[in-house]
């Protein structure tokens, strides 16, 4: 299937190196080798828009061994931004592997792209490889939105992804730096990180992060812990309490006052108070006729 990212993001034919599927092998070889140049490694700088922030040294070492055995099959892609100064558009892992091998020059295809095009190609090229961490992917989506003034829905349509996928990734960017770093270092999974979002309180989020790492909580255990914290944070409803006095003297005086009020009304009320070990007893006699 032909790569459609160039058309979708308005690059025209500037990413044609990614769209060679419809050409014959002879045409491909002729076209590619005409454009390849050997560029001194010291004149090449990484892409400032590179979404990948963590490079696995072991994977770079493996790639270097493969290149040493089979050569660099796919040249890197660069743009020239000053005389004899080049910026990588695609292929930073290959560039790092060649540097590790001690190469002085590296085969490269030079493309004439502006800043926006360079950033977009670098971001898209990395997104297609599916090796980015969740945070790196979120950063790539955010940069594409800003570069092309897109909504989340529009970006999702252009990338062939669900809008919820884009939204869920972007929510991760609101988490504290410590949690984003844990994602980058793969100390926690994306689902762990997403579970922390409802807590809102940064102090609580970091507290649970520490528990996840130290106790090696799985996602279900993390969600249960967070649910408990959210329940504890809810304001407690105060139960209505009847005013009950445990002071027997107040109770006795209240009864006596009531009896006096009845007597003052003209009724001849007889009352008798008795005290026992466990209780007081008041016997009241009210005549049926006045």
Swiss-Prot record:
Q: Specify one Pfam family.
A: ParBc
Q: Where in the cell is it found?
A: Cytoplasm, Nucleoid
Give the matching HAMAP family. ParB_Noc
Family the UniProt entry places it in: Belongs to the ParB family.
For this protein, the record's InterPro entries field holds: Chromosome_partition/occlusion, HTH_ParB/Spo0J, Nucleoid_occlusion_protein, ParB/RepB/Spo0J, ParB/Sulfiredoxin_dom, ParB/Sulfiredoxin_sf
The protein's job, in short, is: Effects nucleoid occlusion by binding relatively nonspecifically to DNA and preventing the assembly of the division machinery in the vicinity of the nucleoid, especially under conditions that disturb the cell cycle. It helps to coordinate cell division and chromosome segregation by preventing the formation of the Z ring through the nucleoid, which would cause chromosome breakage.
Identify the species of origin.
Answer: Bacillus cereus (strain ZK / E33L)
- The entry's protein name is Nucleoid occlusion protein
Query: Which residues, as ranges, make up the DNA-binding region of this protein?
Result: 153-172
User: Which NCBIfam families does UniProt cross-reference here?
Assistant: nucleoid_noc, parB_part
The protein's gene is named noc
GO CC terms of this entry: chromosome; cytoplasm; nucleoid
Ordered alphabetically, the record's keywords are: Cell cycle, Cell division, Cytoplasm, DNA-binding, Septation
* GO MF entries: DNA binding
Principal subcellular localisation of the protein: cytoplasm
Please, one GO biological process term? chromosome segregation
CDD domains in the cross-refs: SPO0J_N
């Amino acid at each position: 299937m032909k790569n459609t990212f160039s058309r979708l993001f308005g690059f025209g034919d500037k990413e044609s190196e990614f769209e060679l599927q419809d050409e014959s092998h002879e045409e491909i070889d002729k076209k590619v080798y005409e454009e390849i140049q050997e560029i001194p490694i010291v004149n090449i700088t990484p892409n400032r828009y590179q979404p990948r922030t963590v490079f696995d040294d072991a994977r770079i070492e493996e790639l270097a061994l493969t290149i040493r055995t089979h050569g660099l099959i796919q040249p890197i892609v660069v743009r020239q931004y000053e005389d004899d100064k080049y910026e990588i558009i695609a292929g930073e892992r290959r560039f790092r592997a060649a540097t590790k091998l001690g190469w002085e020059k590296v085969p490269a295809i030079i493309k004439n792209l502006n800043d926006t095009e360079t950033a977009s190609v670098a971001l898209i090229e990395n997104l297609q490889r599916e090796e980015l961490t969740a945070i790196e992917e979120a950063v790539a989506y955010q940069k594409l939105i800003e570069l092309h003034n897109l909504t989340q829905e529009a970006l999702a349509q252009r990338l062939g992804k669900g809008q919820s996928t884009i939204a869920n990734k972007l929510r991760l960017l609101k988490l504290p730096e410590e949690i984003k770093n844990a994602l980058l270092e793969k100390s926690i999974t994306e689902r762990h990180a997403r579970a922390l979002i409802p807590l809102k309180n940064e102090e609580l989020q970091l507290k649970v992060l520490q528990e996840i790492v130290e106790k090696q909580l799985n996602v279900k255990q993390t969600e249960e812990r967070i649910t408990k914290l959210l329940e504890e944070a809810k304001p407690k409803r105060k139960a209505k309490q009847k005013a009950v006095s445990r002071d027997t003297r107040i109770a006795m005086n209240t009864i006596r006052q009531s009896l006096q009020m009845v007597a003052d009304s003209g009724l001849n009320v007889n009352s008798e108070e008795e005290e026992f070990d466990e209780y007081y007893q008041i016997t009241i006699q009210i005549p049926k006729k006045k």
